[in-house]
Structure formats: structure tokens, C-alpha cells
Amino acid sequence: MEVSRRKTPPRPPYPAAPLPLIAYLLALAAPARGADEPVWRSEQAIGAIAASRADGVFVASGSCLDQLDYSLKNRLSRLYRDQAGNCTEPVSLAPPARPRPGSSFSKLLLPYREGATGLEGLLLTGWTFDRGACEVRPLGNLNRSSLRNGTEVVSCHPQGSTAGVVYRASGTDLWYLAVAATYVLPEPETANRCNPAASDRDTAIALKNTEGRSLATQELGRLKLRGSAGSLHFVDAFLWNGSVYFPYYPYNYTSGAATGWPSMARIAQSTEVLFQGQAALDCDHGHPEGRRLLLSSSLVEAVDIWAGVFSAATGEGQERRSPATTALCLFRMSEIQAHARSCSWDFQATEHNCKEGDRPERVQPIASSTLIHSDLTSVYGTVVMNRTVLFLGTGDGQLLKVVLGENLTSNCPEVIYEIKEETPVFYKLVPHPMKNIYIYLTAGKEVRRIPVANCSKRKSCSECLAAADPHCGWCLPLQRCTFQGDCTHAGSFENWLDISSGPKKCPKIQILRSLRERTTVTIVGSISARHSECVVKNADTGKLLCQGRSQLNWTCACNIPSRPSYNVLVVNATFSFPSWNLSERFNFTNCASLKECPACIRSGCAWCKRDKKCIHPFTPCEPSDYERNQELCQVAVEKSPKDSGGGRVKESKRNRTDGAVQVFYIKAIEPQKISTLGKSNVIVTGANFTQASNITMILRGTSTCERDVIRVSHVLNDTHMKFSLPSSRKEMKDVCIQFDGGTCSSAGALSYIALPHCSLIVPATTWISGGQNITIMGRNFDVIDNLIISHELKGNANVNINVSEYCAATFCRFLAPNLKSSKVRTNVAVKLRVQDTYLDCGTLQYLEDPRFTGYRVESEIDTELEVKIQKENDNFNISKDDIDITLFHGENKQFNCSFENITRNQDLTTILCKIKSIKNANTIASSSKKVRVKLGNLELYVEQESVPSTWYFLIALPILLAIVIVVAVVVTRYKSKELSRKQSQQLELLESELRKEIRDGFAELQMDKLDVVDSFGTVPFLDYKHFALRTFFPESGGFTHIFTEDMHNRDANDKNESLTALDALICNKSFLVTVIHTLEKQKNFSVKDRCLFASFLTIALQTKLVYLTSILEVLTRDLMEQCSNMQPKLMLRRTESVVEKLLTNWMSVCLSGFLRETVGEPFYLLVTTLNQKINKGPVDVITCKALYTLNEDWLLWQVPEFNTVALNVVFEKIPENESADVCRNISVNVLDCDTIGQAKEKVFQAFLSKNGSPYGLQLNEIGLELQVGTRQKELLDIDSSSVILEDGITKLNTIGHYEISNGSTIKVFKKIANFTSDVEYSDDHCHLILPDSEAFQVVQGKRHRGKHKFKVKEMYLTKLLSTKVAIHSVLEKLFRSIWSLPNSRAPFAIKYFFDFLDAQAENKKITDPDVVHIWKTNSLPLRFWVNILKNPQFVFDIKKTPHIDSCLSVIAQAFMDAFSLTEQQLGKEAPTNKLLYAKDIPTYKEEVKSYYKAIRDLPPLSSLEMEEFLTQESKKHENEFNEEVALTEIYKYIVKYFDEILNKLERERGLEEAQKQLLHVKVLFDEKKKCKWM
């Protein structure tokens, strides 16, 4: 909205805005500096905010936590507390418009341990989720895993309160969280209830140790509520003088009312909860009911003062608000501490419990500092230049600034920022931790960084320093009022004058008559003695009058001789200092007209005391009669008597004359809301107004500001009088009327509100005749004077029309005026007039009146008529209230037609209305009639549609049929011939394509050679820890971080007795085997549970592999017993038992070294070669199908023609890769059908191959730019030039799309914008596989039309064979590295387990050799090698694409076929995946049999050799995993089936001791469970 300050349009004339009003509007614009300040907008309402000294600003909104930089322009990281990865609020109950402090989903946001030597800063967060969960995370990045977490620390209710502070206890290195929370409160039935543990239901304040490990924390103490205390709402927590203070107030969450007085609880800053009492706070001054709500809190530690915002309203609206609803009260902490030693009435204290009804005296605030305001919401206090500064937020979006005087007296607040939307300010104001010139202002969903002062609005030095703002000072080099940091050369003390200097110290040039024949020009003010020069010139002629240089310890001064200078009227004086200049222009033309001594001397003229007149400074006067001192001159003027007439109205204290006492009565004041511009006609109603001679209105707003006294404008009659109220800031004021100096009678409250703001005009289009209902949406419409439509006539003349309107606070309704005299199509401006100011509200478009083409009357039943009126299509939004339809029948009969709906068709719009409850409807429908339509001001009669005669129709029908038949025969014959011709062309094209593809496929098989890179650098092996976890938990990524906790940094004293006992119990073989068998017999012990249990057991026994191997032997024998009676060949084939998964894990542990040393390199070469072959041809980005593949299902047979394009790629030099040895100009081959993303990948791979090291940036951090001469164009997968196919499908851009030719130069550059992750395109995009649509054929042209349509998949099956040939040698090398024996020795694990299987077969008297072969195959190739072959990401630090996965599945199947004893009978119809390696399988089978035989023929391993090998492996993996976590997970299964296990132990002999140990372990765990942590 723009505020128009012109005088108004010429017709009709309006009075111009008065000068004071314009000055006020300029003053209002001063806080608008914040309009350009950075703002962060979140998806949900902000619930918490905190600033770190090194890691930015943290903002919690909904279920998200954002880490922002200090400028709020960039988000550094984001944490989603919602598992779905969004920021939605988790309950259906929306928070109120003004939530109480702490009433949100984010309860705590506490950075701590910042700046501690050698320690990383941490962030403690508390949420309502997970029963009031807390997390501790590193401050640097929210995406890192939480270090510690726990539940039931904060309130789990969105409306419940929580306040906390983290501190380091004296004498220790431990950090503690002191937290106060509302754990229990009644909630509506629709809310998600959360019930804390019984021990927490009466807890008010608790102390937690933040250093405890995950799931092993301990509560250090608590302070409980008294039984009669009710709910407490905690607002803040802070440290002072060795104690922790918690401001709070008793609150009934059901009724929404405070039940007691605000208080402050105090505990010791210690390692346990030591209650030190509580103190009640009194901030009731100026409010009859008292202020029982505490809205905000701030400790001003530098002066030991605590500031609080208190309120008497609930904050849920304006219905109970008054000018004295809220107040800022300041308390001395020493007094609070003294009163806190009294008895306690809200908490269960061991001493000093209050008796029932006994309430101690409340602490009184500092009276001079109390500030009463209608709507404060927040406070933050600090000390600047020994001045206490308080920032206050308001409910209408203002940020106020209060500077306390030396005796702590509050001044009138300055408005330093206003939020345009008037959103209530959040209860917490956060200062910038690094720059004290900014403060973070939170409101609704937004956070703004606001300067703490508007220094620049003060234009002169005296104005700057007189404002007494400690943040501002006068910058001499810039000659502006600035922050000290914004002043050039501010490091020099003399260049920046702060408020301690005072306005009298401002530098100023003075011209003084010193002697009869000489006038001195000098400079006064706070100027230290330094080198300076001064020059005085005649401004009219430029003649030099005098000049000088500074003498020692004196500033420059020069003397002007008087006699030659009588005729000089304008003088320019300039003083030059080393870093700044001061110039001033003196005009002596009007000296004689100045009647006051101070004004005379201030202008440079001379005051002659003898004659008491102002003279030209060079005019002679007796020397003793010159007055040179402006201050003495000012004192002399003040002592002289002055006329008291005019000026402000002074309140008369005289008494009324004797006689009858006249009673004056005030009833009301109208309106009760006016804009900040004031109002010239405010009416006060009452009685006996004409009996008073002196009537004034007194307005009292903020208590520390001056009140306004306004004399009555006009007494209309005995009951009505009119006042003209001045402009003011936004606030609510008390109004009282004073008659003849008597008592001021209250007239109620008056609200100054912001100017109206328009957001929407509905509808925005109307017809030229007008009369349509128009609604304007916005806010503050209840203060407008009238609404104006301004439009332009022919000849560019403007006409303003006042329209009648009905306005409420949020909308205005009016009828569009008739503009028949205007152009047919015109836009008019809608304006609001407030006082003499015009506000633009938007435009309303006028179009030509609607055109009605006819109507039809139909009757389906005899008591109802339907009238359908046809209208040309237009852009009018016609509603039921806009239209009135009447049907006339006969001479005097008329019927009102009830509007039903409007239907818009392609050609016409139909308006349907109905006439109900009539007689003879059919007769009326068939007789003569007419219809009148009134649309706003438009009234017209609609003609009835003409209906063709049935007779003519019957004649024309046979002729039309004959024509149609002839045309159909001709068209059919033509179409038949055309179809035959097209089919012949398409068959020829198909034959040609088949011949070409067969020949190309044959040539490729014979000639193609893949240039495999022999030197692919270091193989990127994963370390053992991650290899093991990926094989142990292939589908559960959530265990990685808890098992990989750094075990070296754990405290040796932090051992858990319960886990130690469980570890000892598991090492009992009989007990462990019994537990496993018992668990497997439970029906709900699923296959997933068996696999997880086996993996947890492997980790727990990672350093006891000898023992683990013995367990494996026992369980394997037991499994053989089960299978031998049924089908022995099926043993170990599936993973359905603990031992089968245990065997997989055991093989992974024991063969990790063999995998890394022998198999790893050929395996990595296979993956690299396969990937290189796939990328040699086209790959569809959307489906991942490729031309070169091993899997028919992933074959890209809809392949277009493609060509290789050689690019000259130039890599930009970046800080991440600044080596001089790096080659930055590289030739890269891409395909013209590659997307830009695929081209990036090939460019990255080329850089790695060329330089042996990566570029240094991620793929999504770079962009490609085509350079043609001096022009550059960024290449993107999707941009404005992308082809849009049928149904809105977008075709991704390719190299060919940009018409990039061989030798083109491509620049690789680092993106500046926020990086996004790799794009996964949806179904609305396509690449190479295109939709079968006409739009595609039009785009591609005739050359590709038939080819695309007649593609046949079988034409490209040779590509499978081509891919197989390319990788065949590498594949065979891999297979033989697996089933070969290096140095004629098998790995220990394989030899040991194969011998174990042979021995068991002999013991079982199994003579079938196939059974043992199958056992070995199921235990090694199937259980281990196939898992590795299909998942290279288990072994290497690489990303497996879906296409690579499909190819590796084919290779893995061929690998297993080599171990199969069954002969494959393949026919021509067999799957291609089987046929591809059909000829190779027999050879592989023979090699496998030789491999098995060679292992069997090797000498057996001794038990000593095997134990030594297992012991060495155990030592290798010490401290790799957090074994205590694994033991905890195992215990969860044991305790779940505790009764079954205990019953089994009771039945087994020899396990009595194990039974006792198990019971002991359970007792230890139960005791540990009682100790809770955050």
C-alpha cells in the first residue's frame, strides 16, 4: 500500500494535509529501515530461538530445527524431528494466536559449553515428542547424530511450560541441566495424551547430568510440588550469584486464568537440588485487578536487575485489554534473593513450609522504572555505555526501546521497528552474540535481524546526542549520526562523539565580534587540540576574507578586519582537520530582523547589548556592548518576562467559583479506534457540556510518555462535543475529560491503530453499468473516513467518486459505481481516505456490459418452470446477490425466478433459475412471454430464442443424409488407399532397420574393444567396521551409529555392572545354547528377530571368536539332527534359524582378510569395467535402462540414433583443488543423447582418470557452462527451452538438445546458490524412452517417426552378448580368485568348516557325496560369496546403481550355477539370463569340483592352529564395536521371553547356577531402569 501525500486530485478539491501531519508521517517512516532487514520465514509458527557465539542462530518451528547463519540469509543445516521428514505440527490442536512462554512443541533450545577449552560446543534440545524427549547434539551441524538422548525431561504437552538452564558445577568438569516443567495438566479429549512416570507427576524442578552416556543417565534430584499448589507455568531460568532462578506463575490450564501471584523459585547452583526458597513479585501498579501473568523475563546481569513483563489479560484477544493491561517491572536481584529466604507455598521444602493461608510480603519493583503499556509481550535488557537499555516487543508487531536514566527512570519508548503484518512479537528477544548493534525479532513464522537503533534518522549532531541513545553517536568524518562501528576512523576517540559528550559539545563554527575593528571566526565544541586549518571566504565573490592554522594546543581561528567587509552579506567558513572537514554558511542579510539574542548569535550576527538589537557582525558597536556567549545570552532571555499566550494547553488548578456545583457526565467517545494519523472529528457524548467554559481532553498512553492535552474543538450541544485528536504512535490510551480545571472524568479507552492495508479485491472485474457487490479484504478498515473510486476520463482528466461502503475491521463492501461515461474498457483505482491521506488499495477493472443472446423456458412438471438464459462468455464473477430475474406473462402477471446456478460452456454461459409453486406451468412455457434481467444497475429484456420450424427440418433431413453418405464413401476409399501406401512404406522401413541392426550387431561383436583403464587408482575398500556392519545388518541402517561409538574415549569408571554380569552369563555355553533353542521355539520370534539376535551375538563375542566358533559347532550339529531325519540337502539353504545367520557372520569375520587381499581387486575391476561398458552407450535416466547390459529386463531397446561428441572441458580453479600439477583442460567424450547430469558424471570421471584424484566438489555442487566466443550459457537438465510433450511430460535436455558439436568448450564452475541433492525425476519427465504420442512425433519430425514406432526388442539382444564379451576376462579372473588356492593353502575358515562338515557326514554315516557337496555350497558360496557379488557396496565405498545391481544378479546366478550339481536343460525359449553363460557353466563346474577336492586333500588343521588364527582375528577387532549396546539388545530378547527361558533352565539339569545368575542380572537391570535421564 502506498500512502499518497499529494494534495488530492483536482476535482472535487480536498484540503491539503497540514504541515504537522506531514512531519508525523515522515517520523513514522523512520522505523521503516527494517523493511530491508533480512528475514527468515519458516513453515510453521516458531516455538524457540537461540543464538550461539560461533555457530549461528537456531530456530525451532513445528517439528523442525534450523541452523541459520547470523545474517539469516542461509540455512546451514536442518534437523527433522518428524520421521516423515517434514515440519508439520504433530497434533490437531493448533496453538493460540499468542502462545504463553514455553507453550510450543519445542521446549528447550540451549547452546552450552561454548568457549570451554578443548571442548566442542553442544546444543540441548527438548521437544514434546517421545514423552518430552531431549537430545544433545554438536553445535556445528544438526545433521550429525545425537550424542545423548532421553525421555520425560521436558513437558510433553504442547501447552505445558518448560524452562531450563545448563551450567557447570563449581569444582567439577560436569555440566548439569536444571529444568522446570509442567509435566501434568488436563487436556481436551481430542489431544494426544502423554502420561509421565508416576515419579514425575508431582515434579516441578529437576536436575540432570548431561554428561551421562546414552541410556545410562541418572537423575540427580528433584523439587516436588505441594499437594495444593496446582499447575505452575514456568517462564524462564537463569543463573545469578551462585543460584538458579525460575520465574513462574500458578495457572489453571482448564479455565485459562492465573490462580496466584507471579513468583520466583530459587535453587543452589550445585550438583544436587538444594531449594533456597521462593519470592512473590508485585507488579500491580496502575491496574485494579493486579497483573497475575508473567509473559517474558530478562536478567540484566551487569546491574543485577531482573526485568519482567506482567499482564492482566490471558493474551487470547483484545476483549479484556486496557491501556494498563501490561507493565514492565524491574526488580533488584538482591531484594529477590533476600525475600526468597522466606517460607515456601508452592513446593515441598524440607524447611520453611508456609502455613495454609500464610503468604509473605511480595517484592516491590523499582518504582521509577515501571512502564505501563496496553500490550507488551517480551523484554530483553542490556547495558550500553553504563546505561541500561531495554527492548520491548508488543502484541501489534512493534519493537520498542527504553533507555533508563541514571536513577533508573524509564524514558518514553522509541519505536525502532514495526512489522507490517502486525504479528505479535515472540516472548523471547535474542541479541546478536557477536555484534551488539543487532537484535533478533521473532513473530509468528518469521525471524528478523533488526538494528538496535535508528541513528540515521537524526540529522544533526545536537539532535543525535540529545536523543540520549547509547548506541548512537555523531561521526565527525561522515557528519552523520551512526553506530560507532559504522564511523570511519572511529578507532580514534575524537572522531566519534557519544552521548556522554552531550549536545553542547557538538562542533560548531562561530563568528564573534571581538574588537571594534576585528571579527573572530573560530570553532567550539568537543574538539581536542590538533592540527587544523580554517578558511573564510565571501560566498558571493569568492574573495578570501581570512585564513589560519592551528597553534600549539589550540584549534584554528582567524580574524576578519571589519572596515573592508561592511558589504559582505554571505560568508562560507571551512575548518579542515586531518580526517574530516566542517563547513558552514552564514547569511547576514536578515540580521536586523532577528529580535532574540540567542537566534542572533546562532546565525553569526552580533548582538549589541546597548541598543538591544541584532546587527551585521562587521558593523561597529561599542566593544563592551557585544554579547559573545550564547549560553549567557540564553539565560538572560529566560529571565526576562514572556507572554504566556498560545502554546500547549496548561491544566488549570483553580477552583470553581462559589455557587451550585454543576455535575458533568461522560457517556462515551466515538469512534473508539482511530488511525495513527489522528482524527479531526471525535465525538464525546454526555450531559451538561454547555455549562462549562473550559473543556479539555487528556490522553494517557504509555505511562512514561507525556500525555496529550487537547482543547475541545466545538461544543455541539448540551450532550455532544467534538475534538480534533493529533497523530500518535500505535497504542491504546486512556481518555478523560476535564471541565473547568476540575477532576478528569474517564471517557474510556481509545486505540490508535495502523493505517488500513488492502490485500484483495473480490471480484476484481465488473461491468460498466456498475451495481455489483465488491468486497475489499485486509485489515484496519474500521478507521477509514470514506472510499473513493478514481478513474480517468477522455482528455486525461481524473474524476473521484465517493461510494457508500460498509466496513468492518477486516473487510469493506460497496457497490461498483456506474461508469457509462468512461471508456468501454478501463481500470479504476480504489482508494481509502483516512483524514487527508489517500491510500492506494488496488485496481478494479471495468469491462463492457454482459450480452444476453436469448432464453428458453422449459417445464418438466406442471408446477415448476425452468428459465435458461444464454449469455456470451465473459470474465465476470456473477453471484446470487448480483442478479434478479423476472418473467412476465400475459398483461399483468409476473413471476420472480429464483437463481440456481451458472454454467460456462465453450461458446456460451447459461444462467439457470426456477419458478416454483405455480399453476399451468406447461401453458406458460408454450405461450408468449418476456424475461427481464437486472444485473446491478444494468436492466434489460432478453429476447426468446427462435426455434426452427419442424416442417423445414423434415425436408432438409433426407438431403443432408444423402450428402453425408456420398462424402463417407469418398473419404473411406481415400483412407483405404492411403493406409495401404503407409503400410508398404513402414514395412520397407522395418526391413531396412532390421538389416542395419543385425549387421551393426555382428560388426560390434567382431570389432568392438573396450579400453579398460588398467590403472584405476587405489581400491576404495571400506574399513572392517563398516564392512562387518553392512553384512551383519544389510537392511537395518539404524544400528550403525550406536555400534560405532568411540570406545577409546569411554570413562573406565563408567562400567555397567548389569552388562558385565550379562556378559559373564553369555559366556556360559550351556546357558547360551539353551537360550537360543528356547527363543527359536517361540512363535512370535520371527526370522528378522533370529537374524538380529545372531548379529548382536556376533558383535558381543567379537573378541571371543574361539568361544563363538564352539557355539557355532554346537548349533550346527543340532541343526543337522533336525535335518537328517527329513531332507539333509536343504540344510543351510535358507536363513531361517539363528545358526544360519551366525554362520554368515562368522564367514564374514574370518574371510574379511582373504576378501581384501585376494578377491577385492578383481572384484573392483569387474564393477569398474561393467560400469564403463554400460556408459559407452545410451542410458535412460528415468528408468535406468541401458543399451549395454547383461539383463534383458534392463535392455534399452527403444534406443535412438546417437553419436559421440568430443568436448574440451575447462575446470575452474577452486580452493578445494589448487594444486599446480592438476591438469585443468581435459578432452572428454560424451554422447549427444546424454543428459547434462550424465555429462557431469563423465566429466568427473575423466578428471579422476587424468589426475588420479577427484575434483574436490560433489556432483550437485558444480554446473556446466557452454562457451561460444564471449557468450556463456549454463547447461541444465530442465530449463525454459525444454520440450513439453503431450500430457505435460517434460523431456530432459541433452547434449544434442543444445546442439553442442565436436570440440566445443565446456567450463566446469562451482555453483553459488544453495546445493540440492541429486534430482530424482518423477513420472512427469522422460529421457530416451518417450511416450507414444502425436506430440512427440511432431517434435521429432518425420525422420524418427517410423523408427520410434517400429522398434523391436529382439533386434538388440546382441548387446547382451557384446557386454558379456567386454567383461568376460575380468569375470573369469574374479571367479578363479574365489575358487583357487593361493600358495596351495585354503583360508583357515574354509578348510576348518569343510573338514567339520566332512567329519559330521561320516558321523551321520551319510554316504551320498552330493549331500556334503550341497552342504559346502550352502555354507560358503550361497551364504557368503553371492551376498558379496551382489552387493559391492558392502566391500567398497561406492554407490550401486539399479542397473549395476541387475547385471550383478546375472553374474551371481551364473556363479551359483557353477556350484550346482544339476545339469541344466536349456531350450531356445529359455531366459536370456540363463542362455548368456550356458556354454561357460560346464567349465566352471569342473573347476569347482577340483576346488572342493583340493581343499579336502589338504592336510587337516590342528585345533591349535585354528585357535591361534581365531585369537589373532579377535585381537584385530578389539574396540571396533560398542559391545555393551549389543549386550543390551540381547537382554531385550531375554527379558521379552524371560519366563519361557527361566522355565527351560529349571527343567535342565546342571543349569541351576545359570538360573541364579540370570535372576541376578534381571535385578541389576531393573535397578538401572529406575534411574532415568533426560
From Swiss-Prot:
It is a single-pass type I membrane protein. Disruption phenotype: No visible phenotype. Keywords: Disulfide bond, Glycoprotein, Membrane, Phosphoprotein, Receptor, Signal, Transmembrane, Transmembrane helix. GO terms for molecular function: semaphorin receptor activity. GO terms for cellular component: cerebellar climbing fiber to Purkinje cell synapse; membrane. Its main location: membrane. Detected on dendritic cells, skin Langerhans cells and neutrophils (at protein level). It comes from the Eukaryota. GO terms for biological process: regulation of synapse pruning. Receptor for SEMA7A, for vaccinia virus semaphorin A39R and for herpesvirus Sema protein. Binding of semaphorins triggers cellular responses leading to the rearrangement of the cytoskeleton and to secretion of IL6 and IL8. Monomer. Homodimer. Interacts with SEMA7A. Belongs to the plexin family. This is Plexin-C1. The lineage of its organism: Eukaryota, Metazoa, Chordata, Craniata, Vertebrata. The gene is Plxnc1.
